[in-house]
Amino acid sequence: MNRINQLFSTKQKDILSIYFCAGFPTLEGTASTIKVLEKKGINMIEIGIPFSDPMADGPVIQHAATRALKNGMTLKLLFDQLKDIRKEVQIPLVLMGYLNPIMQYGFKDFCRTCRETGIDGVIIPDLPFKDYMEEYRSVAEEQDVRIIMLITPETSEERIRLIDEHTDGFIYMVSSAAITGAQKDFNAQKQAYFQRIADMNLRNPRMIGFGISNKQTFETASAHAAGAIIGSKFVTLLDEENGNAEKAADKLLEALKN
């Protein structure tokens, strides 16, 4: 069974997934950051593939991607860094990146290398659902790689039902149509959106991302979904701690408690 499906079959609430950008703040820190996060009890990890034009990302992750590219991070290097990761790490690993670098690598080769490396799923924010259905789905399924689709408050119920029917893993609920970034709490409008999707009784579990940074936002997200994805907050802490993932993780977990 794919590790993503395994996670959601054994844990339905308070799942914590952490995002960081490969190659930031240092080129060589990717594998060690993953190992630290698993040791700290994180349930799932999203590893960002840096790209020069990350349209869905706020200033924190854009800055991380720019620096990672300057450091020399590439998709090929990332796979090289992760080639032995499954000797030590058991939790689900998801790659998050834009279509351009993935297509340059070759989608079939990309999915095959994901399987060989032990990557369980991929989030591609700029992959249209129609293209996923027509061109990409069968290739990914062949390699047991889950393609995770995003929905926003603007996504129609019809589209959400289609995504739920034709994907497997989890649905990434973007908390707002805006770019990524931390916020103190979710307003009533966003909470109504979370509840509206919860009431649809979808087949796939849901994870809420964009804007999770503290106890309040994590608890709100977890009340309406299986858990939350934290990106900008952890990337900021990683930068402040000069790549010391242990200190950054401790500070993040502290923020989620108090």
Regions found by a protein language model. Name each.
Residues 70-73, 118-132, 146-155, 174:
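Catalytic beta/alpha-barrel core
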Residues 43-53, 119-130, 171-182, 224-244:
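Glycine-rich phosphate-binding active-site loops on the catalytic face of alpha/beta enzymes
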Residues 27-37, 155-166, 212-228:
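Catalytic cores of alpha/beta
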Residues 78, 195-204, 213-219, 223-258:
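Alpha/beta catalytic cores of nucleotide-metabolism and tRNA/nucleoside-modifying enzymes
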Residues 16-20, 45-47, 93-97, 122-124, ...:
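Hydrophobic faces of well-ordered beta-strands that scaffold small-molecule active sites
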Residues 1-20, 83-87:
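N-terminal amphipathic alpha-helix/helix-capping segment at the start of soluble metabolic enzymes
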Residues 1-7, 52-61, 73-83, 102-108, ...:
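Active-site-adjacent beta->alpha loops and helix N-cap segments on the catalytic face
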Residues 60-94, 138-152, 188-206, 248-258:
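Alpha-helix-loop-beta-strand connector modules within alpha/beta enzyme cores
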